[in-house]
Amino acid sequence: MISLTPSLFLNKTVVPGCSTRLSLRQPRTIITPPASLRVFSSLGSNQDPTGSVLIETTATSSSSLETSAADIVPKSTVSGGVQDVYGEDAATEDMPITPWSLSVASGYTLLRDPHHNKGLAFSHRERDAHYLRGLLPPTVISQDLQVKKIMHTLRQYQVPLQKYMAMMDLQETNERLFYKLLIDHVEELLPVIYTPTVGEACQKYGSIFLRPQGLFISLKEKGKIHEVLRNWPEKNIQVIVVTDGERILGLGDLGCQGMGIPVGKLSLYTALGGVRPSACLPVTIDVGTNNEKLLNDEFYIGLRQRRATGEEYSELMHEFMTAVKQNYGEKVVIQFEDFANHNAFDLLAKYGTTHLVFNDDIQGTASVVLAGLIAALRFVGGSLSDHRFLFLGAGEAGTGIAELIALEISKKSHIPLEEARKNIWLVDSKGLIVSSRKESIQHFKKPWAHDHEPIRELVDAVKAIKPTVLIGTSGVGQTFTQDVVETMAKLNEKPIILSLSNPTSQSECTAEEAYTWSQGRAIFASGSPFAPVEYEGKTFVPGQANNAYIFPGFGLGLIMSGTIRVHDDMLLAASEALAEELMEEHYEKGMIYPPFRNIRKISARIAAKVAAKAYELGLATRLPQPKELEQCAESSMYSPSYRSYR
């Protein structure tokens, strides 16, 4: 597997100065909330003397400024306009002005600040102190009751996309309540926030787009990406999830509308891994799209051009990666998400030695699948080296999983990696990958080209290779046909079948099909969720090989240890930590993944194992090493509970 070597620098960006020329008379003293004084909209560049700025100063006392229209000197101006008695520029529409506002986060403004808003949970004392009287109904309710109320509302919706939109709206109005809701009801809401619903949300992103989430960097920003990153209001970024939208789940090229993926992933970093929301930055790199339907869609929000490739693409990505390091330092995690195969492998290889990069499609998927296979050994016995693996799909996920399995076999059995690969076979769109095809296949497939006669059909490959484990990463639905599953069941007492493609419509087979066609003997897991299946009086609970088991805890482990490079051994440590979470009660139901309801505890344990491995390898920079890493992970997690305001 590709060994990653990341490095980033953490430096603090200086906020440019504000040039709005306001002359104020003697200020009056009033009580202010513990929020911030906001002057203006976005961050301007250092070269712009009249650049628009956002200034935030935390209130340390109970005094602030209050002015009336009469307090403003009539001739003071903003960006050259002629100011009237009300402090507004009396300019024509043709005269450029600087749009600005002066507000304190209290009262009406406080209710519309998602970071501080508590809705009806503001106490009577807080309502008096922060000018909220009359702006809210008189009742005061707890955060728990708010959660109960919203869950009641969400359950009235019949369409998953409606639930998704309601959750995104909540995130933009009351951040802490959003995360409280997601943490408390993670098993029910995870399919809403992420797969499979996020796939439909990305497909319809232009139609449902209301307000921007994340940072959009297009070819139009080439040469200015450093300044664009400074427009983001938060400066202490710890995790970036970035996509170029070319391979969104199993849905293909969705261009700029792939932003739903970074937003969703980072929501899970916070809810499941405890990374602060303010430390997360979703980014979409827009280089166009080859999706004709989107190019002709009047609601499409991205560049209306064919996708840039080659040098133009590489230069934009290199500028982005360089700017990230300059702005946020060398210890920020950069997670590549849903890039096309060729770019995914190239970016990982190119920046693995200079940045702290992680590809969830290659490495996260591999780690969670390996965890499931380790757990499945409880049912089938033996070690991984005793099994034979056949993959349908030889892209990022397929080759990434195959390489991590081979690495685990190599380490546990003390055999060369090349020898460990011989029990792993891959099938792509042209059939079984064999030595005779070596000259015509992509470089990342070549390690899996073994000596064998060519085979075109999957069912024939199953009969010839006789695998004990069948893994689907093809992105093509219904490819594990009845013939394929029945053949696996004839060859094995307990065939392991993993149908990993997302979303549900692209799954190689359903849970019901796997259990029925194998007479209830299959050990099954999927990429998208399936309901429990009853077969001949026994209830089977299909596992979901969801990357959300791994990447939140993995990222937290990197952050808490100050790791400067991702190493393959960290992925193995994460897999083993997840497999250890299975209890006897889970095995009795045929499960190879633990329930999601304990995901924060699981993430803390994964983080501890990843951090421990980083310290062992000498890649951690946060010294000295904490004695209790799991306790350290738990204590560093973000809490969504409301805070009391003075």
UniProtKB/Swiss-Prot annotation:
Site (described: Important for activity): 361
* Gene expressing this chain: NADP-ME4
Q: Which organism is it from?
A: Arabidopsis thaliana
Positions binding NADP(+) in this chain are: 247, 361, 390-406, 502
Family classification: Belongs to the malic enzymes family.
Compartments in which it is found:
Plastid, Chloroplast
What is the designated name of this protein? NADP-dependent malic enzyme 4, chloroplastic
Specify the enzyme's EC class, one word: oxidoreductase
Say yes or no: keyword Glycosyltransferase present.
Answer: no
